[in-house]
Each structure stands twice: as C-alpha cells, then as structure tokens.
C-alpha cells in the first residue's frame, strides 16, 4: 500500500525518528503504525516509543464525588477555545451531575443528552462528544485535577493528604497499575521479547541477552506501577516506601487525560480562527 505523508508525520511525532526511517518502517509494515513503532524500538531507530498515544483532542475532564464513589467524565470538543466556553462547560457539568446521581453508563448518558448535544453543536459550531465516564468505589478517596485536562481519583486506606499527594503523583507519572505484581504476564513477556531483541541487535549473544533482560524486567514492572515509581515529592523513595512509612495503602486509581488515543484531524489554521470568530459572534 502507498504510504502517505500524514502517516510518516504521525510516526515521526510519536517516535522522534527521522523521516526516512519512518517511511522505511511504515513500508515494511504496510502502514501499520503500532507495529512500526515496535519494530523501530527493537532496531533502535526510534529515540523512544514514549510519545505513543500523544494527546490529540480538546475538551475537559470533570470529577464529582457521590455516595461512596467518584465519577470521572471526559467531554470532547475540537478546539481549546471551545473547551473554555461557558456553554460547553455547562453542558459537561450537567452530564456529570446525572452520571454522579446513579452511575449511569456512557451509552445511556450519550442517549439521554443527544438532543442537547446536537443543539449545542449547532450553536457553537464544533463537534462535541460525551466520550468516557469512569466510576471508582471507595470509602477513602482523594481527587486531583491538573487544569481541565487531567483528572485523577485515588482510593485506599490513608489520610486525605496522603491520598491527595498520591493523586498528584499519578497525574504526573502516569502509572498503569497499582503494584508491580499487578502487571499482566503477557505485558511483561512482550516487553521482555523487545528488550532481548534490542540486546541481540547490539551484538549480545542470546543467552547473555536473556540474563541481562531478566534483571531489567523488575525495573520495567516498577516503572509502570504506582508503588514501584519514585515519588515525585521525594524522589529518593518509591511511592510504596512512602505508603509503608505512613501505614497506608492504595487500592485503586483512575487517571483520565483529555483526548487519549484520539487522532486530531489537522485543520487549516486560518480557517480554524475564522470559525472561532464566527462562533463567538453567534
């Protein structure tokens, strides 16, 4: 299949690799960007795959506490201009109130607010989407919002201040699991295979590569889990060590960031500004 300039551009942004390397990787995978990233990690052509899943949509994350649970809601729009619009925010908060009143599913929320959403789209001039709703149970909770774009709720057995600090850590460090032991075996095995191939591409024999990587897996599971990460407020200690000192535990967390996994369509800048001006006069 023909590789487009847009595909090459996306792969460059997500890996930091050169244009020719990206084009070559995409050609080898018939345009499969995710497979290209994995192959480039193995070959060392990419600086990192850490930019995968870059934020590519606008909107807001809202949080509200209910009876023994909290709700996190994501509502999207096309530009950050509309994300700050009072009509958009009023709509998002109305959806949040209904969600918090009874743990309403995303499908039911979308259906219930479809007519209101369509009217708002006509008024504002941008597409709007009630995208995600998440519920988290727990008697002891703390939440943290970083601007309008990141929302975190943490549950556990700890004082409110400790949980709040952990929530701030989750917002900044993006752990995927609570504990290293929570990382699924298939995730560990996939990373192990990637690391072994990287080591072998560096000239290490397979037996030595496997021994080297065995030690790296402990580091990997620590890096992707909350309790294994260095605490942002006290980097010489892990979050797990801080919790142990305080006699505290974290049982669960949810972190939402605006636009995760959404590819934002590139718009002509002049046309976008004109649309924003027109909307403001409506």
From Swiss-Prot:
Entry keyword set: Cytoplasm, Elongation factor, Protein biosynthesis
Region Involved in Mg(2+) ion dislocation from EF-Tu: start-end pairs: 79-82
Main location as per UniProt: cytoplasm
UniProt xrefs under CDD domains: UBA_EF-Ts (cd14275)
A Pfam family hit: EF_TS
SUPFAM superfamilies cross-referenced by the UniProt entry: Elongation factor Ts (EF-Ts), dimerisation domain, UBA-like
NCBIfam families the UniProt entry points to: tsf
Family: Belongs to the EF-Ts family.
Protein's UniProt name: Elongation factor Ts
């Amino acid at each position: 299949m023909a590789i487009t300039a847009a595909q090459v551009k996306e792969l460059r942004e997500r890996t930091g690799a050169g244009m020719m390397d990206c084009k070559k990787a995409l050609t080898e995978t018939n345009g499969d960007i995710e497979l290209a990233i994995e192959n480039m990690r193995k070959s060392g052509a990419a600086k990192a795959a850490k930019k995968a899943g870059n934020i590519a949509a606008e909107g807001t994350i809202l949080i509200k506490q209910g009876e023994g649970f909290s709700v996190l809601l994501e509502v999207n729009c096309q530009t950050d201009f509309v994300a700050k619009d009072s009509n958009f925010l009023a709509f998002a908060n109305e959806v949040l109130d209904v969600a918090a009143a009874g743990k309403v599913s995303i499908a039911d929320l979308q259906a219930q607010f479809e007519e209101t959403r369509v009217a708002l789209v006509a008024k504002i001039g941008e597409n709007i989407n009630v995208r995600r709703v998440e519920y988290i149970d727990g008697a002891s909770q703390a939440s943290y919002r970083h601007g309008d774009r990141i929302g975190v709720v943490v549950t556990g057995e700890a004082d409110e201040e400790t949980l709040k600090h952990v929530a701030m850590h989750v917002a900044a460090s993006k752990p995927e699991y609570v504990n290293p032991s929570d990382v699924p075996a298939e995730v560990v095995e996939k990373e192990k295979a990637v690391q072994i191939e990287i080591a072998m591409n560096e000239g290490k024999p397979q037996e030595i590569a496997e021994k080297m990587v065995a030690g790296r897996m402990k580091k990997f599971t620590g890096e992707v889990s909350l309790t294994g990460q260095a605490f942002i407020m006290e980097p010489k200690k892990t979050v797990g060590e801080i919790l142990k000192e305080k006699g505290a535990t974290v049982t669960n967390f949810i972190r939402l960031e605006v636009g995760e996994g959404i590819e934002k369509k590139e718009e002509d800048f002049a046309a976008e500004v004109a649309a924003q001006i027109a909307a403001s006069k409506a």
